[in-house]
């Protein structure tokens, strides 16, 4: 069943970061917008050739804005719990659950899986999490989470460089992180 327009608009109210202390709430809509901005900047910094094709530009924008839209029905499932679900139910259990919640969303994800678009949006999603928590995280737990997010981004860059050598991943991520003042020698 597809999400209705009214359900999609609830992204303005779905909250993120509910297991990390933050100075202010972030909504799914704010996160999705920031991911779209970062994904566009990242694609340009990587010199992604898809930017020369209107249909791929549109797909990048659409997926950036909707990559987490299922959360208007599920809420923002914390990443640590996603890992527990995978341990309990096996690899792909979270995707199977999302398919039950909204098969159209799951179908959209299957269409971009393994593409440059998926890679760019995943990197943008990770960068956005670091960006938000760097500015809004409070306390020792938030610092540990932020350190973990940076480690994950570094590993993602290393892995993606191997699997997608045509993308200038490290250069692109460095440029975007520098531009939005995410600091660290972890890349």
Predicted feature descriptions by range:
Residues 159-187:
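Charged phosphate-binding loop/patch that engages nucleotide di/tri-phosphates or the phosphate backbone
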Residues 1-19:
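Short alpha-helical hairpin
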Residues 68-100:
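Acidic, Mg2+-coordinating active-site segments of isoprenoid diphosphate-utilizing enzymes
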Residues 58-62, 102-144:
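Histidine/acidic-rich helix-loop-helix segments that form or flank divalent-metal centers
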Residues 37-43, 58-77, 122:
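Active-site alpha-helical segments that house and flank conserved acidic catalytic motifs
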Residues 39-40, 94-111, 152-159:
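Histidine- and acidic-residue-rich, metal-dependent catalytic cores
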Residues 22-32, 82-94, 118:
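Active-site metal-coordination segments of metallo-dependent hydrolases
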Residues 23-60:
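Alpha-helical phosphate/pyrophosphate-handling elements in metalloenzyme active cores
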